[in-house]
């Protein structure tokens, strides 16, 4: 069975040749596999490990047109991302430092003007991936959940405080 046939069989409640698999590999894992297993640099790591599902994601950020690099040197990079946050990443580090969020004060929520959900740039990578994968894999779409996406707008500590102190605002924000 191909990956697509395997997933479709499972979704149709027919027995596949094996249980369909999915994983999400970090960039560092991919690089380690290339080095330690002697794989070619252009290896499709999902295909190599028999992953049966591909995930296509459109740009779900509220402000994709406002992203910009604010500062960059050999050690760190500071950007305004599509969530309106200012975040700093460090070379060879997976996590980031959040320096600023879009909804600093509760009143900021009423002043936000999101970019159109119909912007072509939101879907360019999504459409390219679906087209590339659809013949061989089952392609699933995803969006992020309300908790993480809300923390991106408000900041995690602020949002958790809002949940406890002002549940009505937290609901409006999420």
PLM ranges: what are they?
Residues 1-174:
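Catalytic cores of TIM-barrel enzymes
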